[in-house]
């Protein structure tokens, strides 16, 4: 009987050890996938300098509509820096401390961005009624030739006030004509999982930096011509 009990204890110890090893492998695999996704996202936007950050807190609720990251002014983070995760745009930095920053996501109902499809500009906004579906709303789309359809890719526009150009927001999931017969509204499915965010990439240049650089380049070109 004692021998059987001893064997059982040994088997239990082996099972516990294997379970621990298996959990470690799962964690390692999850971490590898996360790092691979971050790398792929970084490679999508090589034209912009970026820094990785970890989310350290969020507002109450299921959604990451406002959250805090572990990077701040000491890392080059500034207000209005754009933030990425998964496969697209997450939001924008609204407040910065030395070693932290607050991000307001695009699903927040106070957020809006000028965006562009392959056909025309429109305004994308957070919508509380659409959050549970992982969707955003868009409006002010002038699509006179009816070319914008479900599945259309939406990115930030060069005329957006605070978002740099070309950041992926999502795909059109619905589009309908307004009663004025001039503009259209609809919804967009975002590629970002706003319920399970953990890490983000922060673009460390602002839209205004790009505007200033373009203005300076234009001035230099004019001076050279003279």
Language model features: what each stretch is:
Residues 1-6, 10-12, 17:
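N-terminal membrane-targeting segments
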Residues 3, 19, 24, 34-226:
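A secondary-structure micro-motif
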